Amino acid sequence: MSKLAEVLKEKNIAVGWLYAYIHFITEVLCFYYLTKLTNDSAIIWVIPLVYDALAFVPQGLIGRFCDKFSRLNIALIGVAMLVAALIMQFGLNSNWILSIWVLCIGNCIMHVAGAECTLRNSEGKLAHSAIFVAGGSFGVITGRLLASSIVPLWLIVLMALTMIPFILLANTYYKDENYKETACLNFNYANKKIAPFLIIVLATFVVIVRGYMGYGIPTSWNKTTTQAVLLYVIMGVGKALGGILSDCIGIRKVAVLSTVLAIPFLCFGDNIMIISLIGVMFFSMTMAITLGILVSVLPKKPGLAFGFTTIGLFLGSAPIFFVKIIDNRINIGLIVIMSLVCTFILLKILGKEHDKSKTLERDDNWLWKCFLIDFI
């Protein structure tokens, strides 16, 4: 308990909580928009697919921009875009294609701003960014519930504006050194013996699997609003615990905990809520691990590193829009195989727990040679 208390009192941990609220409100706004829009649309399945593509994929590019211009408080621009999208769609009845573009870019900006702020102010710890990311899960279900009730647009806009003081307060934690390229050099979680390019590919693959399983996990028990709320709450708790426990007991232990122990609960929890929720919580922990690995490889580009995780989430969730596996035996087989593969990958690409003295690869100019995206 003393170690847990120590982690929860880590330097600048408040930044994680501040951006958890900002992330929560961001997802409330986005899923309020999506739920309202899809309820009135004849192309209901297209809109979430378009949203996922536009909200997830560009985050790497925006992240790279923020890496270059780290002093720019881009989150305030994101708030303005989210508010504009809501007013365009539900106040001015504009074309949804235009408003969803504005909404998604605003969403991208808010995510990248949170990642940049929590990573740069964490001194190599994972709890800060894990707490920030966890806030979004609570926002998803809250936004859906608000869209199903009678809530005036002005109240939703007011909720959006409450993010501004939190953004300004989070920004006060920045010191001059946190804006520099060296801010994330304390992230040393990746295996130094494996090529950085290969680590990025493998870590992104693990994120793809997590993205798929987030939609593909059999949860036939999930029939009521209360059960849906519990599912998203447990997802959020799992994401936060992944970072907190990694700082407490070590990232390799959490890697095994979050993948191997999740298997029986995910496989046999289809009709039993509590068993399923335990599995969901365990596997959600991998978020912090993969982010920590990617930032270790790209310490001078934390925004870009975060972007790889969101691209992975999109690639993992996209197949669900086109193919749905009905046979639970096939689903369970996939869960077992993919979980074991992810365990093997994580243990290979993670560095040794006590090998923190050396850096992995601090001259990351190799990146443009692989991806041709070091464009600024």
Question: Which residue stretches match the model-derived regions?
Answer:
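Helix-loop boundary and gating motifs at the non-cytosolic
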Residues: 6-52, 209-219
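Glycine-rich segments within core transmembrane alpha-helices of 12-TM secondary carriers
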Residues: 125-147, 306-322
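Symmetry-related core transmembrane helices of the 12-TM Major Facilitator Superfamily/SLC fold
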Residues: 153-172, 331-349
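Extracytoplasmic gate region of multi-pass secondary transporters
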Residues: 192-236
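C-terminal transmembrane helical hairpin of 12-TM major facilitator-type secondary transporters
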Residues: 253-289
